[in-house]
Every structure is written in C-alpha cells, then in structure tokens.
Amino acid sequence: EYNEERGKKVIKYVKNFLDETVPIANASWKEISDIKVKGEDLVFLIGKKENSLKDKQQFIGFNGEKNKLTSILVKKNKLHIDILIDKDNMIGKSDKASIANVVIESALSTIIDNEDSVAAVDSEDKVRCYRNWLGLMKGDLIANMNKNGKKFIRRLNPDRKYISRNGNKISLHGRALLLNRNVGHLMTNPAILLKDGSEIPEGIMDAFVSTLCALHDFKNKNNSRTGSVYIVKPKMHGPEAVSYIHLRAHETRHDLV
C-alpha cells in the first residue's frame, strides 16, 4: 500500500537530486508544474513563466508528444536518467509536474557465475549453466514464475526507445553488461573425457563453451557493444597461472576462428 507521507519525502529527495544533477536555469524542479518540448529544447513551466535547463545539452530525448510527454531522457557524466511522467500514476498524481518515477542508468556490470555461487558438479549441472548463458547471449532466456498463486513469465528487458531532440530514433541498452565467471584452473569435470580417460580441466571447458555461446552476441550485439565476450578467470595465483590461461585462450580463439 502506498504511503503518502513517505512518498512526499521520496519526491523531495528526487527533486533535490534532479536540482543537483540536471539543474533548471534560475529555478528548481520543486517549482515546475509542466514540462514540454519546444524545438530541440526542454521547457519547464512555472505558472506562465518558461525556463530551460541550465545546460541545454543535457537533454537527449523524450517519449510521447511534445506537449504531452510520457518520459524525458537527460544525461550526466555519460549516464542517462529517464524521468517518467504519468498524471494517472499514484505517485504522479501527487506531483505538480506529474513525475511518476526516475530511472537511472547504471555503470555496473553483472557476473554470470559458473563457480562459487552455483553448485555445478556434474554434466547435468554444467549443461544447465551453459544453457542459461546461451539464452542470455541469444536474448531468448525466459523463466516461468508462480508467485502467490499468480503465474507470469520473466524475460530479458528490451532496449529502451526514445525520440532524440532533433527527431531521430534513439535506442539504449535495457540490460546490464554480462561477464561469465569460469571456474578456477585446478578443477576437472567428467562432462568431457580426454583420450586417456581423464577428466577435462573445467576452466578450459568453461572458456571454450562460454565463448562459443557468445558467438550469437557477436552478430546482434545485445550484450557487448563492441562484439566482444567478457570472461572472468578466477584464482590466478601468480604469473604461471596467468601465462597458462593466456596461452590456452589464444589457442581457443584460433580454434573458434
């Protein structure tokens, strides 16, 4: 249940944040009653008076109509801030400018772990890990959920679409940058047996399969913007371990090519 008193404090905090991050010239976000787009600029209404951003170049794009916005995209330190506007929203109703939410782009990355945070000890476990990573690289991973009697499907967030200040289309990544954490060098796994019957070094298997799965992303670039795969190799205790994995990674790259 929405707590209106707490909501007022949150709104005040957010307006202070916007005043510091994307300040309005000679005014405060607390004062505005409406926001519109005129030409290539944002216009903030305080009564009948019009104001603009102190730095107009912070305005990147928007959604909705210029006189009836549903979101505003601004930028600070190369990270985007999406200001959502909805006068019918429970929070938007309590704000003079109908601001319902503020979504901040994160510079964080996300590690998909094959080691300490999962108990992948046999072939079936490893296949499950690889299948999840493949789904992330192809962008089609889903999870069927049942929570409190309600069934729903979780999917990867789509890219976020906007109209730029000059009328062009903008697309921003809607997902965090993913890295794959392989297992350490000392582990072996019976999922693949070598010619002599011994188990494959699990870190080598992880490196090969996780890179193979990432080939799907090289084409569509849903994860990497540069057509790369990001692999974390843990527990390297000295130059010998680093040299070992560097050599094996170089050989794997040539095999894949």
Language-model features and meaning:
Residues N223, R253, V257:
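Catalytic or ion-translocation cores adjacent to nucleophile or general acid/base/metal-coordination motifs
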Residues I245-T252:
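Conserved small/polar residues in nucleotide/adenosyl-binding loops
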Residues E1-Y244:
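Active-site-facing alpha/beta catalytic cores
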